Amino acid sequence: MTQYWLGLDCGGSWLKAGLYDREGREAGVQRLPLCALSPQPGWAERDMAELWQCCMAVIRELLTHSGVSGEQIVGIGISAQGKGLFLLDKNNKPLGNAILSSDRRAMEIVRRWQEDGIPEKLYPLTRQTLWTGHPVSLLRWLKEHEPERYAQIGCVMMTHDYLRWCLTGVKGCEESNISESNLYNMSLGEYDPCLTDWLGIAEINHALPPVVGSAEICGEITAQTAVLTGLKAGTPVVGGLFDVVSTALCAGIEDEFTLNAVMGTWAVTSGITRGLRDGEAHPYVYGRYVNDGEFIVHEASPTSSGNLEWFTAQWGEISFDEINQAVASLPKAGGDLFFLPFLYGSNAGLEMTSGFYGMQAIHTRAHLLQAIYEGVVFSHMTHLNRMRERFSDVHTLRVTGGPAHSDVWMQMLADVSGLRIELPQVEETGCFGAALAARVGTGVYRDFSEAQRDLQHPVRTLLPDMTVHQLYQQKYQRYQHLIAALQGFHARIKEHIL
């Protein structure tokens, strides 16, 4: 009987499930759409009961379509978005809707913390910045605006922690994810009550479940879950992975010469390093990586291809091929039309919002699409340039995410950055990485390093056109000037209001 490992991947828009054999060969993938709720402007929520129903359904569909039985699955892992807030009450029931990482309701709280110097106080301990989608920001918002709900909190979790609890009935917070929550002291490798005290949320210390490892077996499929999903009761479930970590694993990032860019709802640039550094040029975000003594370092903002998805939804049906053809039909780096990809947040200040600038009657849909492609790449460059100060010997960027399927977009990224672009040929990095964690946890590999060496994926390469690079650098500078001008505008508005 062939053995398989199940990897679940819970993202912003889809819940996916993939099956892989001992050698990493895919036996099937199923996906179901996820619904994000926005009861008020700037809010992003998810019905927790509905998410669990979706999880059970996607597992059942995977088993049905693949012909694999629950008896053949010997380990399960979960990869998921980071941050956000999934709460259970003191009776172990979902406490309202989950709040997603793209939620912005806590903006005033974050702004107040910034004015009070809290981020500078936290950073040496947590190695995190402070923003609206962090669990701590959302917890403080609940304390101030929904005190009755806050008082009922029995357990604080994030996405894959909640799904793991649904599968096993065992609570825990997985380390690669909780280490980027501002609840975790990066040097100590554990929760730190000083942090919740400084943030004014010390009441939830009792509700923080144990920290668990990515490949640690945290529980087993319950009898009830087995009936509902078709899985076998007693199947081990490992801690899982923050999706950014899963992607870095699948991209084969293992030294300081290569970075990983994830292009999805979020623009994320990641690198792997040993040890923490003090006195760096920027407050880089660190997180615990899967190998002992290693950390993932990244820069991120919700400024990537989610902007294109929104735009195409407004225009009606247009295929990815049609978009690429439209963008490719125009001169590279031509014109002065700009798009600011800040529909879901920005990397240029809390007040910055999205929009086109420089639009005239001569512009067509193709020009707008090209501006979106360029704006997303320019926003990625903000993070990439900062990361290249930290990883000064980088010569290669490995890219994953939907835009990696567009040679037009990837060539643009190569031309703007001047870097060698490598495209790992792995389709579902979340599912594959989660199943990889399960294989490590069930003893197929001694550790993630051995697994990564054994499962290297083929890579496609694109090289930059350095003539076009010079043209794009000029346009990128104009983009930066536009950002600076708008920052000045918002500063003057703020002064006037105050």
Say what each PLM segment does.
Residues 1-97, 124, 152, 226-227, ...:
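N-terminal glycine/serine-rich phosphate-binding loop of ATP-dependent small-molecule kinases
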